From Swiss-Prot:
UniProt xrefs under CDD domains: CLECT_DC-SIGN_like
Expression by tissue: Expressed in vascular endothelial cells in the heart, in perivascular macrophage and smooth muscle cells. Expressed in plaques-surrounding reactive astrocytes located in cerebral cortex and hippocampus and in leptomeningeal vessels showing characteristics of cerebral amyloid angiopathy (CAA) in a double transgenic mouse model of Alzheimer disease (at protein level). Strongly expressed in lung. Moderately expressed in heart, skeletal muscle, spleen, liver, brain, colon, testis, stomach and kidney. Expressed in neonatal astrocytes.
Gene Ontology terms describing biological process: cellular response to exogenous dsRNA; defense response to bacterium; immune response; phagocytosis, recognition; plasma membrane raft organization; toll-like receptor 3 signaling pathway
Residues covered by the Collagen-like domain: 452-511, 527-586
Amino acids binding a carbohydrate: K691, Q694, D696, E706, N718, D719
Record: residues binding Ca(2+) 3: Q694, D696, E706, N718, D719
Listed name of the protein: Collectin-12
Transmembrane segments: 38-58
Lineage: Eukaryota, Metazoa, Chordata, Craniata, Vertebrata
Amino acid sequence: MKDDFAEEEEVQSFGYKRFGIQEGTQCTKCKNNWALKFSIVLLYILCALLTITVAILGYKVVEKMDNVTDGMETSHQTYDNKLTAVESDLKKLGDQAGKKALSTNSELSTFRSDILDLRQQLQEITEKTSKNKDTLEKLQANGDSLVDRQSQLKETLQNNSFLITTVNKTLQAYNGYVTNLQQDTSVLQGNLQSQMYSQSVVIMNLNNLNLTQVQQRNLISNLQQSVDDTSLAIQRIKNDFQNLQQVFLQAKKDTDWLKEKVQSLQTLAANNSALAKANNDTLEDMNSQLSSFTGQMDNITTISQANEQSLKDLQDLHKDTENRTAVKFSQLEERFQVFETDIVNIISNISYTAHHLRTLTSNLNDVRTTCTDTLTRHTDDLTSLNNTLVNIRLDSISLRMQQDMMRSKLDTEVANLSVVMEEMKLVDSKHGQLIKNFTILQGPPGPRGPKGDRGSQGPPGPTGNKGQKGEKGEPGPPGPAGERGTIGPVGPPGERGSKGSKGSQGPKGSRGSPGKPGPQGPSGDPGPPGPPGKDGLPGPQGPPGFQGLQGTVGEPGVPGPRGLPGLPGVPGMPGPKGPPGPPGPSGAMEPLALQNEPTPASEVNGCPPHWKNFTDKCYYFSLEKEIFEDAKLFCEDKSSHLVFINSREEQQWIKKHTVGRESHWIGLTDSEQESEWKWLDGSPVDYKNWKAGQPDNWGSGHGPGEDCAGLIYAGQWNDFQCDEINNFICEKEREAVPSSIL
């Protein structure tokens, strides 16, 4: 280091001599030195600015390009190394320029022009990077919007798939319900058949019971006759027994008398011994007969008691059987009523399920249309997404091309810098040759020179003690890229990359042709039962149920309060002519009062019997049911027509008289032209009271449409098929009530 410093002082102390001219210490060289120093400072500043700008540009490019600009980072690092090498070369040139001649000013000016060109190129590069930054931001925004749309599309597709699965599950559930209902109907039909069979069996049993009752009655009557006969026989036996007792007493008296006679007539004992023995034998026979009679009497009494007990048992059994049959009949009637209600409920449920299935089919058709629309929209969105992805790929390719262009430009610029450096080295060598020809004079001592090069490595010293572990140093700059090695084996699949930047939205593509319908997927598992739905609209009027069995006659009710006195009745017909009376006294004949023949009085309100009056019209509410044409003919036979409802007041009045009853035909139809409803006289409909969603002409495509109108349970209008059976309402003008003639 000291030798280098001494050499620099010697160089600065000597002057130079050329063409016989020798300059002193105070000459133009000082001015040139100051200019050189100023130019060197400017070069340092420019190099520092250049390095700063290049570092900033490289940092921004690396920050914005992410994974796409990995090559840019390596190139930036190589360029930094080259620029540091350029700086070191420039420093060396600056050190050597202090020793060189004045001719370097022109070369410095050329170098300045080159640096200005580099600045312009760097400005262009910055502008391009800013533009690329804007395009990258746009691409990121477009990519984010595409990701959002894709997420929305996925959500909508998931929702649609969930809806389709739920609809399929509901359809499967309804199919299960329908199959269960069919099974229930088949079971009910079997139960009805079994009940009919059991009913026939019960009827047979009842007939058998009636026969057995008749037979029991006959047996009871026969038993009563036999009991009467036995009672008569017992009375006869009692009378015979009494006679026998009297005979026995008489015999005892005779024996006593005989004993007295024997005592008195011992002499006649021998003669009468045979008679006595005979009498004893007869008495013994009589005693045995009496004992047999008493046994027979006991047997007869026991038999009569057993017969009486059996009669009582038979009467109890008869009462029990009557009670049981009555209970069984009541149970059978209750069962029949329950079966009738069940059948009515089943029919209503079947009609409701049919209506519900119709609504389900309509809803499914709506869902199909919405699904097709959404699928077409999704296909359009997917095509647009594909187009945007293609555009993003093209943009990325263009960006890569621009990056390659920038790399090539930077390579050319670095090559130009290396060429400039080589030219500077050549100029320095020329300047050195020129300086050798100068005569060097001792000049004033110059400023302290820069730090010298590192000396040679000395011999290794003795190994010292192991020190503490130092702090981790900063990572060094990456080295230059080495030569490309041989292709290694295929590595394992890498992790999924980070989410790319969002591209710009591309133009909407043309709508593609609809694809072929895919195969029907397997039916899924039935889902959990959903929450109970809201109460639906009242279903259509069901078919009339079967006529129920006649109930038992109830007990008479409490007599109500006495009503108001009625209107005077119609005067009766004149009675038969009586016999002529006795002749009256002669005198002046008085004139008889003229008297009108009695006529049947009409209704007070001007309407026939069973007709009701409202304003100036009469209405007939039928109890029988007919189809539309038969109802119209019935009203025409009554010189009237089916009712025409032309005001709200008339509608409310008719509603009061039909609340709680079944449907009624009115004179409204669209049989002439579909959906053009007219009254039967051809007049248009001014007042309307249709139910919500009516008239719907249900049945088009499935059978005859609904072309006739009627009133339903709520007083609103509904369209029916004309061959259905309903009640009806007739209407005609009220007759004028004539004043009564006294």
